[in-house]
């Protein structure tokens, strides 16, 4: 089994703390459903540190949010945050892509957008199904929550997560217009 480096463990801790605390803040759009800017943390940290970090940040951070908020831990939604973080981290595995080094192309951005959107949809459907099957929640309530959460997460991903990740990569781009004279 691969060991997690100290740097990765620290990144997971910081990301989970940020995601957990920022997850307490959001705008209500449906029953128990919010637009939460914290989702951008999963995009940025997933792109920086990969799918395992994204998964753990989502799982730990969402557990922190639910614990501090005092409404109990909703495991389906905790797991969905992990799935979203995991999906966001796939981009980090692409050859030539690096937020840290500022190396990316349009294909990388498209890949992040597609894997992020697919991850959000899969995760939210999973959370809804979990709530119906395991938690015994009413179907009609969950349909509203799933639609609201999907729309909210897609908006946050496209308006905050993706642009912040691209901005970080651009700011780290190593380019110069200096030429070596012979």
Swiss-Prot record:
Residue ranges crossing the lipid bilayer per the database entry: 9-29, 40-60, 71-91, 114-134, 142-162
Q: Name one Pfam family in it.
A: ECF-ribofla_trS
GO CC annotation terms, alphabetical: plasma membrane
Sorted alphabetically, the keyword list is: Cell membrane, Membrane, Transmembrane, Transmembrane helix
Which domain of life, per UniProt? Bacteria
Q: Does the keyword GTP-binding apply?
A: no
Membrane topology of the entry: Multi-pass membrane protein
Query: What are the subcellular locations of this protein?
Result: Cell membrane
Q: Does the keyword Acyltransferase apply?
A: no
Give the protein name, as stated in the record: UPF0397 protein BCAH187_A2708
List the source organism.
Answer: Bacillus cereus (strain AH187)
């Amino acid at each position: 089994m691969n060991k997690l480096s100290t740097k990765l463990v620290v990144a997971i801790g910081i990301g989970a703390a940020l995601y957990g605390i920022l997850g307490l803040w959001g705008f209500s759009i449906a029953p128990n459903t919010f637009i939460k800017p914290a989702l951008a943390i999963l995009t940025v940290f997933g792109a920086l540190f990969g799918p395992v970090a994204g998964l753990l940040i989502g799982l730990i951070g969402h557990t922190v949010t639910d614990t501090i908020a005092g409404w109990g831990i909703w495991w389906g939604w905790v797991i969905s945050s992990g799935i979203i973080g995991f999906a966001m981290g796939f981009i980090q595995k692409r050859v030539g892509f690096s937020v840290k080094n500022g190396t990316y192309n349009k294909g990388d951005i498209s890949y992040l957008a597609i894997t992020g959107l697919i991850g959000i949809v899969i995760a939210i459907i999973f959370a809804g199904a979990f709530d119906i099957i395991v938690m015994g929640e009413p179907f009609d309530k969950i349909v509203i929550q799933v639609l609201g959460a999907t729309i909210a997460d897609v908006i946050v991903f496209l308006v905050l997560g993706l642009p912040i990740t691209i901005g970080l990569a651009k700011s780290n781009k190593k380019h110069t217009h200096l030429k070596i004279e012979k």
